[in-house]
Amino acid sequence: MYPNLYYAFKDLFGIELSGLKLVNTFGFFVALCFIVSAWVLTLELKRKQQQGLLNFTEEKIVIGAPASFSELLINFLLGFIFGYKIIGAFTIADALNDPQRYILSSRGNLWIGLLMGLFFGGLKWYEKNKQKLANPEERTVRIWPQDRVSDILIYAAGFGFLGAKIFHNLENWGDFIKDPIGALISFSGLTFYGGLICAGAAIMLFARKIKLPIVHLVDAFAPVLMLGYAIGRIGCQISGDGDWGIVNNTRKPISWMPDWLWSYQYPHNVIGEGVPIPGCSGPYCNQLIQLVYPTALYEVIMCFIVFFILWSLRKKIKIPGRLFGIYLIFNGLERFAIESIRVNTHYESLPFKPTQAQIISIILFIAGIVLFVQSKKWVEKNKPNELVD
């Protein structure tokens, strides 16, 4: 396991760069997930635009105005945080020994933070001042759907993280009550379906606001969501963030299968779960007592397969909404299956004692079937470009 990129570079390339301790492996793959997803979503929105399914909207902007107070303040705050926390980490002796604790603490370098804040604010002022006109002009510009990708992903990231935390704490209410502040600010403890539901709701509201047809947007998102989830699960597997399966002491069904593909102890996992590894000193020196199913790895494999299926179908399916229905069906099946061997909280009072994810996966599966079957009827009642609601 590689808790952060420092250990990955040290093991794979023999390079020791202390600054890489600040880059959590799971966080790195989440960032990579958003970058790749943005690229693929842009490609799909452009394709739908060329098909005439999506159109531009017009907005008025002011050209030649000086930097506003809010712009200067935002850039100052970004620079201050960067200097205070990131650069400051290299000026504090023990900051990199426990990067996560340092990031969540109030420690940092005040003077470097102030200097970087002034520098970022100054850059914004200089940039706007170069473009300043004696009489600022108001112009009307065309905004295409692919130009909105960065805004869409900001909504996805913000509301996705919020939803993932809320659903996780609802599922683990006892742990939340014991330490509510720690549960809320911790980087661990995220529930995918919580993020999917909250981010999805926020993006659909944003799409309605900018008059972007939701039915075509969700179809564009179908392969993107599977691809992004697969990349994110790579981070779970490599960092050992606790997203593993139940104990697996059974024999491999196939003799040539690698041991780590059937059962694993997650040595050097990022959450420090298990018992000390003999001969290991320093942080991240624990491994699980018993072998468990590497469920995150299984999800990586399954979700990449589903992504390629959706990607191959996207040009063949002509009925709007049907591709997203297929995504919901696959999503529900995949998650329901993996939950049967995954460590999670079960609702003992319900029939077959499901997990929160299994309940939601059943709902998504049914919704996917309904959307797949009914989408043609809905399209016949509404012109494709009018399917905004």
Could you say what each language-model-derived stretch is?
Residues 1-389:
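Hydrophobic, membrane-interfacing alpha helices
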